[in-house]
Amino acid sequence: MAVNLYDHANQLEQALRESDEYQAIQNAYAKVKENQESKDLFDEFRETQLSFQQKQMQGEEIGEEELQKAQEQAQKIENDSNISELMAAEQNMSQVFQEINQIIVKPLDEIYAD
């Protein structure tokens, strides 16, 4: 009997949406959006992250001034309890993703284990 992996993937998606980790991200992000200062800082930080990623993908160097700005943003973010809570929730979800990924690739790892 053939297994439809996409059905299982869709079930996993639904389970993730119902998880405590996902709910924590939703709740933390709602707090960020409710506080305009937190929201502005978070949006600015995300723009900086995207800019850095684009530059890295294009092989461009990140300038000293840009690094300084990013460090200043990171310091502000550490001092913002709403964003800190969101980032902690994201880290928890990232850990779940890593553990799920290990489970998913286990069959391939077993093939190549010898």
From Swiss-Prot:
InterPro entries: Com_YlbF (IPR010368), YheA/YmcA-like_dom_sf (IPR023378)
Family to which this protein belongs: Belongs to the UPF0342 family.
Protein known as: UPF0342 protein SSP0954
Source organism of this protein record: Staphylococcus saprophyticus subsp. saprophyticus (strain ATCC 15305 / DSM 20229 / NCIMB 8711 / NCTC 7292 / S-41)
